[in-house]
Amino acid sequence: MNKELASKFLSSIKHEREQDIQTTSRLLTTLSIQQLVQNGLAINNIHLENIRSGLIGKLYMELGPNLAVNDKIQRGDIKVGDIVLVRPAKTKVNTKTKPKVKKVSEDSNGEQAECSGVVYKMSDTQITIALEESQDVIATTFYSYSKLYILKTTNVVTYNRMESTMRKLSEISSPIQDKIIQYLVNERPFIPNTNSFQNIKSFLNPNLNDSQKTAINFAINNDLTIIHGPPGTGKTFTLIELIQQLLIKNPEERILICGPSNISVDTILERLTPLVPNNLLLRIGHPARLLDSNKRHSLDILSKKNTIVKDISQEIDKLIQENKKLKNYKQRKENWNEIKLLRKDLKKREFKTIKDLIIQSRIVVTTLHGSSSRELCSLYRDDPNFQLFDTLIIDEVSQAMEPQCWIPLIAHQNQFHKLVLAGDNKQLPPTIKTEDDKNVIHNLETTLFDRIIKIFPKRDMVKFLNVQYRMNQKIMEFPSHSMYNGKLLADATVANRLLIDLPTVDATPSEDDDDTKIPLIWYDTQGDEFQETADEATILGSKYNEGEIAIVKEHIENLRSFNVPENSIGVISPYNAQVSHLKKLIHDELKLTDIEISTVDGFQGREKDVIILSLVRSNEKFEVGFLKEERRLNVAMTRPRRQLVVVGNIEVLQRCGNKYLKSWSEWCEENADVRYPNIDDYL
């Protein structure tokens, strides 16, 4: 079974990689820099501020905004962990997506004018790119350019790691020794533990509900658990309690916590920080959110605290800074040779420090890809039988392709005696680039969560969290019935909460038509004046709807008149073009920069007091595109706490031939405050 599974995934990953590279290459060779920026694939108007040494052969290039153009970096869709190219603004965009380095004209001393690296840190005022130290000479030449730009490219490292993992899975000979792998390849039946089941006597968090306690007790007593956490059900709090209870039961327990993205694991890291002794918690990789609580656990930062390591690093940084001032190419070359010798010494000392930090920790937090990092796996080179981990926890498992989830299982084979998966298979699936092969799409969209419940139809290992602490009951009702078999309950503390209950809101309690008292509003945009438009500036002509934008603006201004805070409002649209147009109006023209505007993907895992959802699609053919994706809409409609405002054409949803959309729009006609706007009132 392991060979069949690996073979299926290897062919699917190969196809997905090819599609990804072709798509990215086509975009980079056909679109201008400005178009790439508009589509979130590039960042321009930046310059080099600093270069410094990083961890184990890394070089950090720190880039800031060009203040003559803007005081903030327009980040687009580029995020921590992305592979990017950094180039001077005069370099042409025309490129293949493989990380290559180009020569520029002889007046630049023949040096190369392109660097490839990984986005290590990001903020509105600085981007840090981690480069291999072999690019040091090239990187230094960028000081002489006033403008640089960044291009997002295909992350081939990710595909390489998944393929390598699948090959290793196929090579495991029978009989398989690893009990967890036996479950996952359907070579071992799952029988829940009933003989030695021990309930936890005392929970540390007094606010846990019964479903959370049941999930924790089950996970403590069984070697395979899926914690199914719908929106707002406190999945992360459940995991935090589980981790603490594992350490209480066995203080020597070693836990690896993984997730598909930096943000997914940083959320757990932030919550664990005040509850676990600092020396027991270690973060490997690139923290996406640069909170002090995350920094203090970063392997990079902790290893730099070693005095000798610190001294050598400072000496290297000093020489790098000197190189900025050297005009003579020969002198610069000599300087780099000295830096290389220092780096060799630094690398040896860093490995020793890193090994000590990993061994003293009890909880290691990293992404799924980071779980096979050389820092962790180097411990097995010294001692193949070294017991590094006991428990593996994968959070947001439904956002990861299954081959990603195998990376820690194969990298640390025969280590884990317990696997806990947490997530919600009714929210966004992993992002798949393939569009031309249904088998590949099915293979890669079917998550480990989905496949396990298919292998074990009794679902004995699935523990459902049934109380949500986010949404007003009326907002929760349709998602609960359509996606969770009506099992979701609204906690009493949130069931009836409204915008009027916010301390800043100064609405009049006696006025019934006040928007702050209504949890669910739908602006029905039927009619020719609310037709969608294809935006030619965006990839594949993404759609936008000017009439809907006008309604969104009016509703925001109405909420602001009641003093609903800007940062309590979020605007979501499935379409990039609509998001772009909304940002231009609300952020640039109205200067309401604290209102968050994003696609559905950008809001997963987030929440706001009020969400305005702009559906965009309004056409005579009743085409709905993205809106057919139930899980995408489920995410959008479960983000708000106190008010959900939908702006969209009800007739299109009811006549598009999609049962889910028809059911939703009909339910809203009965349960929402439906309004029929006249475009003349908004112009």
UniProtKB/Swiss-Prot annotation:
Membrane among keywords: no
Localization per Swiss-Prot or TrEMBL: Cytoplasm; Nucleus
GO MF entries: 5'-3' DNA helicase activity; ATP binding; ATP hydrolysis activity; double-stranded DNA helicase activity; RNA binding; single-stranded DNA binding
One GO term describing the cellular component: DNA helicase A complex
Record has Nucleotide-binding as a keyword: yes
Residue positions binding ATP: 229-236
Subcellular location, principal: cytoplasm
Signal sequence annotation: none
Induction: By heat shock.
EC number: 3.6.4.12
Catalysis: reaction(s): ATP + H2O = ADP + phosphate + H(+)
Subunit structure: Associates with the hexameric DNA polymerase alpha.
The family this protein is said to belong to: Belongs to the DNA2/NAM7 helicase family.
Miscellaneous notes: Present with 1040 molecules/cell in log phase SD medium.
Role noted for this protein: DNA polymerase alpha-associated DNA helicase which may be involved in DNA replication.
UniProt name for this protein: DNA polymerase alpha-associated DNA helicase A
Species of origin: Saccharomyces cerevisiae (strain ATCC 204508 / S288c) (Baker's yeast)
Lineage: Eukaryota, Fungi, Dikarya, Ascomycota, Saccharomycotina
